[in-house]
Amino acid sequence: MLAPSFQEEVDRYHLAVPEITRGNPEPVKELYSKLDDVTLANPFGGIARGWAQVEARLDQASRQFQDGQMLGFDTITSYTARDTAYLVETEHFRARLDGAAVAEEFALRVTSIFRREEGYWKLVHRHADPAARPQSRRSLTQPAG
């Protein structure tokens, strides 16, 4: 079988990411490298490093969301080299957060880095934050929650 192209991996990624907002982290886990240098920085704070921490953080994130729906991806830019690639996007969702009665729309600014391992593209870093829209200067000085 021919290894997937980077665009094919991005297509898989776009199918997997919304599953987190439906309480299912498994499709995203399948995309990740299992090596100790992987990282995840998500909107719930902190940076997970190494597969064990990243896996736990994905499980935690999936428990925060219910009834998620993907509204779309806006690709800002991407770049592919021989063995590394990155993708910068805005992801748009609707989901219930932390058991809320009503779903809310939200957008995440996301940078994802991939590495080719044994011929296959694997996710090695994902940074997602809610700063998809311009933030006030004051938001920079707010204490971390």
Question: Across the structure, where does each feature detected by a protein language model lie?
Answer:
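Conserved catalytic core of Hanks-type protein kinase domains
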Residues: 31-34
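A beta-strand edge to alpha-helix "cap/lid" segment located at domain peripheries
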Residues: 1-27, 37-145
